Amino acid sequence: VLEDSGDRPRDFDIDVNGTRNVLDACVAAGVEQLVVTSSGAAYGYHPDNPAWLDEEDALRGNPEFAYSDHKRQVEALLAEYRQSHPALKQLVLRPGTVLGAHTRNLITRLFEKPRLVAVAGSASPFVFIWDQDVVGIIEQGVNQDRSGCFNLAGDGALSIDELGDLLGKSVMHVPAWLIRSGLWIGNRLRLTQYVPAQVNFLRYRPVLSNRRLKEEFGYIPRKTSEQVFRFFMAAARQRGQL
């Protein structure tokens, strides 16, 4: 569930119990390989995240952010099945922000605002991966019968100020406490779908290293993070969304 439905038990049932159902079905049917699109969100949004997250770094999630917490729990479940059912190969992909010609979601709507909002004192940048690179990675993983866990991101990262420059929009650097207060009021008045807990989503973004993707998996993303964003931006402007 990409966007919180407001019914956390329902979302948990879909995300975590649904994954368990798929795993059980794979084991029962003798499936040899399972490809799972997890998320960089499984690492969590934490102030002590390393500058570049490697696949060996801890998956901590955030209990206050259902999407991140459920991704962490799904990954824990996958790890259990890797131990108990080693015959089922798992290829687990952890993408950063996926963008393509037609992407529109909770993240891209941040870029549609007249001005971008940043948390004062936070330098946490964005990493992007082109949706067609995600397709290529899955295709290569299936064709080569690969297993393992890999971050998906284009080369480089972009700060919120760099995104503002590309979009031609100003960036407001607002204290975290003020953003939380504004989101609390806005959410109570149904003026925004964002909630106070999502401040850390902007403040401590997981920045994914793609070293293992390139060196071990053997896939070189066709677009860098900046090229992905420029491609998305051009397509969104054609649709009148930016």
PLM region spans:
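NAD(P)-dependent short-chain dehydrogenase/reductase
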Residues: 82-131
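Substrate-positioning beta->alpha
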Residues: 21, 73, 103-106, 119-142, ...
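Catalytic helix-loop patch of NAD(P)-dependent Rossmann-fold dehydrogenases
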Residues: 13, 49-92, 97
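Conserved C-terminal active-site "lid" loop/helix of NAD(P)H-dependent oxidoreductases
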Residues: 131, 159-162, 189-220
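Mid/C-terminal beta-alpha module of Rossmann-like enzyme folds, strongest
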Residues: 135-194, 210, 230-233, 239-241
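Conserved Rossmann-fold NAD(P)-dependent oxidoreductase catalytic core, especially the SDR/UDP-sugar
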Residues: 17-66
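Active-site beta-alpha turn of Rossmann-fold NAD(P)-dependent dehydrogenases/reductases
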Residues: 35-39, 94-96, 153
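NAD(P)H-binding glycine-rich loop region in Rossmannoid oxidoreductase-like domains
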Residues: 1-17, 25
